[in-house]
Structure formats: C-alpha cells, structure tokens
C-alpha cells in the first residue's frame, strides 16, 4: 500500500473562498478568493486534489504551480507543486499552464504541464508534490498538428493510461508504463464539433464521453460540449452542450473543465473555470487572465446522455469523510 506523504501547507490566506450558510453555520465555499483556471480535480487517499493554472497575471505569465487540497470542496490547503525555474528545458517563453495528474500503476504520480508551448512531465511520490521535472518535454512543440497545450489524462477500464492534449486538434495516445513517454505512431487525433482545446475523457457503463472547450478563453462564449461513443475509436455522437455561459447571471466563459468520479459511488463532479469576480464582488474583466474555478455535480441521465450543467453563483459542498 502506498503511503501518501503530506508536507506542510503554505500559509496563504488569500485563497479563502466566499462565505456561505450551510446547516445554520457560515462556512467557506467555492469559488475561491484566488484567480485559478484550467482546473484538474482528482481524488486521492480520500481527499480532493485540485491542480490549476494560478491566474491573474497578464498574458498568462505565471511561472509556478500550486496544488489545493480539501476534504469537502470548501475548506482548502495550499501546497507548492512545481516551479518552472526548476524545469531544465524551459526557455522562459509563455507561462505555467493547465496541469493534469495521473497515478501510475506503481503508486507514484506524474504531473503534466504546459511551458513554452510544450508539454512537460514531472514525477512525485505523493499527490501533494513537489514534483521533479523530467529533462525533456513529453510532447515537443511542432511534433503534432496542433498547438501543444492543455494536457489531460484518462485511465481506461483495462488500466491503460492515456495522455490527451491539443488546441485546434485533439490528440490521444496510450502511455508507456512509466507514463513518461508514448509511441507517437499510436497517437490518434480528431476534431470534435467546433473543438478549440482542453479535451477530456471519462467512461461510465461502457459509454465513452469526450468533452472539450469551444471558442477562445477570452471570449464570453467560451463553453463546453460533449459527445458519446462505444469505444475510444468512435464513432462519436453529435456534440451537445455541457456547460454554457449563463448570460442572465453574468457568468461568462464557462470552460476548460475536467470530470472526476467519487470512488465507490456513481457521483460525478465537474470542475471548470469562468471569468472571475474579485473578493468584493466586482467583475475582474474578460481578458482571459482573471478566472475562477467552480465545482458542480455532473448527472448522467438514464439514456446515457449528460444533464447540462447550469452555472450557479452558490456553492457545492461535498464532504468525502
């Protein structure tokens, strides 16, 4: 059995979330009082682990990643995950974007990330990090017909682990056992719907779901669509809306999501970001660099389709313990 190592949390008060009344008590809730985008929510060792782009810097210029840890999606601790200054191949271009984490068969964790339009991999003994970067990217800029960003991960029912990525075209490839390389000849691609970026996969009851973001991250109409298939090779159904902006509530640019199952249940959670409001409730603007992450339940209908997620202002409180 793998022992999860928990390091000391960072002392940082500015990521506390909005107060909300639950069972006659005021508690913190989501979204957090911190600009965070491109969420990757995972569950390890009975806790939520949320990896994201630390946002709020012009032109997406952040250079380090944090991991946020919670028992209930409401009260969070923050830990350092990876600093691009420790990445040997990073040339200083662009910033630290769109992380995604997978647990290997040996119990270790691989942290995928974007830097300089390349996808890197870093390994850690614990989901808390820190993660030690590999000497070369796992996906080099220009190798595939897409903008090399937005890694995602998927573990199929047979245990095969996959890496997903791409802007403009979606790519998927089965990973080697160490999750640090893949056979480029086995990578497949497609362009679902009006695909822009952030491809994600999940499987339930023999149905595969591909979901992705459409439009530009700076566009108020940034949104999530999905399609269904009986296998990863398709054929995929016609795209349907999954998360659309709620214009009547001024909740815009609802995209770049991921989906996670609560182990031992048929409960599913979707994490996504949208244009942020600052702690005083003022809109932070639609430059695409000031975004907030929210969490919501994801419902699978009896016919296998997904119930459209309605963006809300309130909270989603779901304890694991």
What does each model-found stretch correspond to?
Residues 1-321:
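Carbohydrate-active catalytic/glycan-binding domains of CAZyme proteins
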């Amino acid at each position: 059995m793998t022992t999860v190592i928990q390091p000391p949390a960072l002392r940082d008060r500015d990521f506390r979330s909005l107060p909300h009344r639950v069972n006659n008590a005021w508690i913190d809730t989501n979204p957090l009082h911190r600009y965070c985008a491109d969420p990757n929510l995972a569950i390890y060792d009975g806790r939520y682990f949320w990896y994201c782009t630390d946002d709020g810097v012009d032109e997406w210029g952040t250079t380090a990643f944090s991991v946020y840890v919670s028992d209930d999606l409401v009260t969070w601790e923050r830990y350092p995950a990876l600093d691009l200054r420790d990445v040997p191949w990073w040339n200083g271009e662009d910033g630290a974007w769109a992380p995604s984490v997978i647990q290997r068969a040996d119990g270790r964790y691989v942290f995928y990330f974007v830097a300089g339009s390349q996808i890197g991999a870093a390994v850690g003994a614990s989901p808390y990090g820190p993660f030690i970067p590999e000497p070369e990217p796992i996906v080099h800029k220009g190798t595939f017909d897409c903008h090399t960003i937005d890694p995602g991960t998927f573990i199929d029912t047979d245990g095969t682990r996959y890496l997903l990525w791409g802007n403009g075209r979606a790519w998927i490839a089965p990973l080697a056992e160490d999750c640090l390389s893949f056979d480029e000849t086995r990578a497949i691609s497609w362009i679902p719907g009006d695909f822009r970026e952030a491809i994600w996969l999940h499987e339930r009851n023999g149905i595969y779901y591909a979901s992705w973001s459409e439009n530009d991250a700076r566009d108020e109409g940034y949104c999530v669509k999905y399609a269904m298939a009986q296998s990863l090779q398709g054929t995929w159904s016609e795209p349907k809306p999954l998360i659309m902006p709620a214009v009547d509530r001024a909740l815009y640019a609802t995209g770049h999501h991921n989906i996670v199952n609560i182990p031992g249940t048929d409960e599913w959670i979707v994490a996504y970001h949208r244009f942020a409001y600052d702690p005083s409730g003022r809109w932070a603007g639609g430059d695409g660099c000031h975004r907030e992450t929210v969490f919501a339940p994801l419902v699978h209908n009896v016919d296998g389709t997904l119930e459209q997620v309605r963006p809300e202002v309130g909270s989603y409180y779901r304890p694991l313990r």
